[in-house]
């Protein structure tokens, strides 16, 4: 592997589409290898922009604007970090020889819940929750009746649990609330929602799956808790039998093989008894995987970059650990962070994302903790996160 010098004609260049906290860590890893970094997002001073060589603010669903930047920069690797992107342009650029991570087709299929759910259930026959799609309130009422209450309603495109709610009855007012909530939290164009069967699972995991030039490798399973579809804490390793880990890996391998390309995939799975049930997959680092910054010899971000570049990936768990999200309780531009109490918690680290605008409930940072046991790590991570005061 030959790497050039950033800002010179021989430099190796990556361009991130989406510049949030996950993209920020990818760029930090790239900077360590002397890679030129360009960050793109819909708002200025996004986290990854703060550590990139250059940045652009555009609507990434605007095909002309997106194409103009890609043609201007001519990056070696185009790395989508969010779903709300004009993937038709990515397919076009890939046809002209640009490398899209993992592939333009994978980005298109996984950009919304409909594409990936139909691939998993209807093409690959992978077990999933029962589901229906709806494009109007009337269609949603019929779908809820067919699936049965309780059920989950989500926009087909959203992030961090936005727009997701549980319909607890078949009453019109409950369904109407879910419809309006989904529309308010949706990304992209269109009104379509997915209605999913409510699964009483034993636990849910993220299986970080890396497709590399040397084969597919897996991180130890990551357990996590979500609140309204938004991750609030994760831990690694989650205890599982070897048999169940093998089942999970086989399912992850099946779906990531079809998606193709190299890079890390966040495969979300429900575990119920001896069943593994597919939930979702993202062809990029996963928010629950931030715990790997303290638990593994390579974080998910380093794994992603090394996989993209064709470098060896040797994953080792070095400690039990946990992450706990730091959410804002206020709405403020350019907030400040009092970390005086947080830094007193032993064996913890803070990652403040640097988002320019704090909103109530917005994820502004994460606390990481290592310990001899997952239980101790979870306790310390939460204590550290709760010790951060946003002002």
From Swiss-Prot:
Annotated ranges, domain ATP-grasp: 118-309
Signal sequence coordinates? none
Q: Where does Mg(2+) bind?
A: 268, 280
Task: Return the PROSITE patterns for the record.
Answer: ATP_GRASP
Annotated positions binding ATP: 113, 154, 159-164, 196-199, 204
Q: Which GO terms describe its biological process?
A: 'de novo' IMP biosynthetic process
GO cellular component annotations of the record? cytosol
Residues where N(1)-(5-phospho-beta-D-ribosyl)glycinamide binds: 21-22, 81, 287, 355, 362-363
Catalysed reactions listed for this entry: N(1)-(5-phospho-beta-D-ribosyl)glycinamide + formate + ATP = N(2)-formyl-N(1)-(5-phospho-beta-D-ribosyl)glycinamide + ADP + phosphate + H(+)
InterPro entries the UniProt entry points to: ATP-grasp, ATP-grasp_carboxylate-amine, ATP_grasp_subdomain_1, PreATP-grasp_dom_sf, PurT, PurT/PurK_preATP-grasp, PurT_C, Rudment_hybrid_motif
Entry keyword set: ATP-binding, Ligase, Magnesium, Metal-binding, Nucleotide-binding, Purine biosynthesis
Could you cite one Gene Ontology molecular function of this protein? phosphoribosylglycinamide formyltransferase activity
Sorted alphabetically, which Pfam families does this protein's record hold? Answer: ATP-grasp (PF02222), PurT_C (PF21244), RS_preATP-grasp-like (PF22660)
Enzyme Commission (EC) number = 6.3.1.21
Role according to the record: Involved in the de novo purine biosynthesis. Catalyzes the transfer of formate to 5-phospho-ribosyl-glycinamide (GAR), producing 5-phospho-ribosyl-N-formylglycinamide (FGAR). Formate is provided by PurU via hydrolysis of 10-formyl-tetrahydrofolate.
Question: What NCBIfam families does the record point to?
Answer: PRK09288.1, purT
HAMAP family per the UniProt record, alphabetical: PurT (MF_01643)
| Assembly description | Homodimer.
Family membership = Belongs to the PurK/PurT family.
Name the PANTHER family on file. Answer: FORMATE-DEPENDENT PHOSPHORIBOSYLGLYCINAMIDE FORMYLTRANSFERASE (PTHR43055:SF1)
The protein depicted here goes by the name Formate-dependent phosphoribosylglycinamide formyltransferase
Q: Which organism is it from?
A: Methanococcus aeolicus (strain ATCC BAA-1280 / DSM 17508 / OCM 812 / Nankai-3)
Ranked from the top, the taxonomy reads: Archaea, Methanobacteriati, Methanobacteriota, Methanomada group, Methanococci
Gene coding for it = purT
């Amino acid at each position: 592997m030959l790497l050039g010098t950033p800002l010179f004609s021989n430099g190796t260049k990556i361009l991130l589409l989406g510049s949030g906290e996950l993209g920020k860590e990818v760029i930090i890893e790239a900077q360590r290898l002397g890679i030129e970094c360009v960050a793109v997002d819909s708002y200025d001073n996004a986290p990854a922009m703060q550590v990139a060589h250059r940045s652009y603010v555009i609507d990434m669903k605007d095909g002309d604007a997106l194409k103009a930047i890609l043609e201007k920069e001519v990056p070696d690797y185009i790395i989508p970090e969010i779903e709300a992107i004009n993937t038709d342009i990515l397919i076009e650029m890939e046809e002209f020889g640009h490398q899209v991570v993992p592939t333009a087709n994978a980005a298109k299929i996984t950009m919304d819940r409909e594409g990936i759910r139909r691939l998993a259930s209807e093409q690959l026959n992978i077990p999933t929750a029962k589901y229906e799609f709806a494009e109007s309130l009337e269609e949603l009422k019929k779908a809820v009746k067919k699936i049965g209450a309780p059920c989950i309603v989500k926009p087909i495109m959203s992030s961090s649990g936005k727009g997701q709610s549980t319909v607890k009855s078949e009453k019109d007012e409950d369904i109407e609330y879910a419809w309006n909530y989904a529309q308010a939290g949706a990304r992209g164009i269109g009104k379509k929602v997915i209605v999913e069967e409510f699964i009483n699972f034993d636990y849910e995991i993220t299986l970080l799956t890396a497709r590399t030039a040397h084969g597919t490798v897996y991180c130890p399973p990551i357990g996590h808790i979500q609140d309204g579809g938004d991750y609030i804490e994760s831990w690694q390793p989650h205890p599982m039998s070897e048999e169940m880990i093998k089942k999970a890996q086989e399912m992850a391998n099946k779906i990531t093989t079809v998606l193709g390309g190299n890079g890390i995939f966040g495969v979300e799975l429900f575990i119920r008894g001896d069943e593994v049930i597919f939930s979702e997959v993202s062809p990029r680092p996963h928010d629950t995987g931030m715990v790997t910054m303290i638990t593994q010899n390579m974080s998910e971000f380093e794994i992603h970059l090394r996989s993209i570049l064709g470098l060896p990936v040797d994953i080792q768990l070095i400690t039990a650990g946990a992450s706990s999200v730091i959410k804002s309780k206020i709405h403020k531009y350019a907030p400040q962070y009092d970390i005086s109490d947080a830094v007193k918690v032993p064996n913890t680290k803070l990652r403040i994302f640097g988002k320019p605008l704090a909103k109530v409930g917005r994820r502004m940072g994460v606390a990481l903790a290592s310990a001899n046991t997952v239980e101790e790590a979870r306790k310390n991570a939460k204590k550290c996160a709760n010790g951060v005061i946003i002002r």
